[in-house]
């Protein structure tokens, strides 16, 4: 019986001495976590998709004939060919306002055409429009224009356009629809010239002011070949809000076109656009157009509180430093002292080089370098001690029995 007890106790102690090989002292929490990961994190959606595929394949196998499927394929192909193709829509463009834009001209409040710049709106080839669109060779304001002439507020006279009623030969009208060959303002365009809210002259239309031969001016004077807005115009182009360039410029100068709220080669609004003007009001800016970068868009701003101060966690406790200094003051040198603890987080310190020759009693916190120390092998120490005790007990039992 004694031998049996000795054998049992010895086997238990030996098993505990080698926990990793014999399966004792296993961390069951890890096993539980692994089981949870295995069974809880299953993607149920994949099962649903598999069931759908299986049911589809079963239905095709039971109720359908693959030959019939092949016979239906040419029919479907013919149906696809017969179906009219849906025209592509440019989702970036804004809907036209207060009228329509004509081919060869500029749309209102949004659209831009190559070769000219519109003011606060669209641009058409060859000239600049006011507060809206520009027409080829001239600009129309606040309305509609017809080819060769436009009517204001609805009516148009053949061979000329009237503003708020009357039409002039070779000019464009306002407040209406747009015709081929020119662009209207706020909706319409006129071929050969445009007039705005004022009088129209033969060969051109004037906007709120005077008009020059060959073009229409808005809110000021107009020059031949283009329309100007709210400013002066130079020969061969119309200027808006100030300066004008050859071919017509709005709110800036552009060679061969009018620019709005800025300068552009070919016309630009609220920036620069080559070959056309962008409407700053409608926001329909397209590349290559110069836009203004919004605040915070160009670069990433490091927000307040993003940087974390990790040094605060490593600052030792002043009280702990003082107590430890009192204990090791006489033996403290320029080398790091032992950590204050044998397990967990503690503090260690050493003298600064400048305080190497100071007497121990003269040392203070300013003469020391301190840092937090961490002892991570606490469990290993306890395991060594416990295993040593077990080995001693085993030897005692073996020797005295």
From Swiss-Prot:
Keywords, comma-separated and alphabetical: Cell membrane, Cytoplasm, Disulfide bond, Glycoprotein, GPI-anchor, Lipoprotein, Malaria, Membrane, Repeat, Signal, Sporozoite
Compartments reported by the entry: Cell membrane; Cytoplasm
UniProt PTM comment: During host cell invasion, proteolytically cleaved at the cell membrane in the region I by a papain-like cysteine protease of parasite origin. Cleavage is triggered by the sporozoite contact with highly sulfated heparan sulfate proteoglycans (HSPGs) present on the host hepatocyte cell surface. Cleavage exposes the TSP type-1 (TSR) domain and is required for productive invasion of host hepatocytes but not for adhesion to the host cell membrane. Cleavage is dispensable for sporozoite development in the oocyst, motility and for traversal of host and vector cells.
Name used for this protein in its record: Circumsporozoite protein
Recorded GO CC terms: cell surface; cytoplasm; plasma membrane; side of membrane
Propeptide: 379-401
Residues spanning the signal sequence: 1-22
Similarity-based family: Belongs to the plasmodium circumsporozoite protein family.
InterPro entries: Crcmsprzoite, TSP1_rpt, TSP1_rpt_sf
Disulfide bridge partners, by residue number: 339-373, 343-378
Biased composition, class Gly residues, residue ranges: 268-278
Protein's job: Essential sporozoite protein. In the mosquito vector, required for sporozoite development in the oocyst, migration through the vector hemolymph and entry into the vector salivary glands. In the vertebrate host, required for sporozoite migration through the host dermis and infection of host hepatocytes. Binds to highly sulfated heparan sulfate proteoglycans (HSPGs) on the surface of host hepatocytes.
């Amino acid at each position: 019986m004694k031998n049996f007890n000795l054998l049992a106790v010895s086997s238990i102690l030996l098993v505990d001495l080698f926990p990793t090989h014999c399966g004792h002292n296993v961390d069951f929490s890890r096993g539980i976590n692994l089981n949870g990961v295995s069974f809880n994190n299953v993607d149920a959606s994949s099962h649903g998709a598999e069931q759908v595929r299986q049911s589809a394949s079963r239905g095709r196998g039971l109720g359908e004939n693959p030959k019939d499927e092949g016979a239906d394929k040419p029919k479907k192909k013919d149906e696809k060919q017969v179906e009219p193709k849906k025209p592509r829509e440019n989702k970036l463009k804004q809907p036209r306002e207060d009228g329509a834009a004509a081919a060869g001209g500029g749309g209102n409040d949004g659209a831009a055409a190559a070769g000219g710049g519109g003011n606060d709106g669209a641009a058409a080839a060859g000239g600049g429009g006011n507060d809206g669109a520009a027409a080829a060779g001239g600009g129309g304001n606040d309305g509609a224009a017809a080819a060769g002439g436009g009517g204001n507020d609805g009516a148009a006279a053949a061979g000329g356009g009237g503003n708020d009623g009357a039409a002039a030969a070779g000019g464009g009208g306002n407040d209406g629809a747009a015709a081929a060959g020119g662009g209207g303002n706020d909706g319409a365009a006129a071929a050969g010239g445009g007039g705005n809210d004022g009088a129209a002259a033969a060969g051109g239309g004037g906007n709120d002011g005077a008009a020059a031969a060959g073009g229409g001016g808005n809110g000021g004077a107009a020059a031949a070949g283009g329309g100007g807005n709210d400013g002066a115009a130079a020969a061969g182009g119309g200027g808006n809000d100030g300066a004008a360039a050859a071919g017509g410029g709005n709110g800036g100068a552009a060679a061969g076109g009018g620019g709005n709220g800025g300068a552009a080669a070919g016309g630009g609004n609220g920036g620069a656009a080559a070959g056309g003007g962008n409407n700053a009001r409608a926001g329909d800016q397209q590349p290559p157009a110069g836009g203004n970068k919004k605040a915070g868009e160009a670069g990433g701003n490091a927000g307040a509180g993003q940087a974390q101060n990790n040094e605060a966690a490593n600052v030792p406790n002043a009280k702990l430093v003082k107590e430890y200094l009192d204990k090791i003051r006489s033996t403290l040198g320029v080398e790091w002292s032992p950590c204050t603890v044998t397990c967990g987080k503690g503090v260690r310190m050493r003298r600064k080089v400048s305080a190497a020759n100071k007497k121990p009693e003269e040392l203070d916190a300013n003469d020391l370098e301190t840092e937090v120390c961490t002892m991570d092998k606490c469990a290993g120490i306890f395991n060594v001690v416990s295993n040593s005790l077990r080995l001693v007990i085993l030897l005692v039992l073996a020797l005295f029995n």
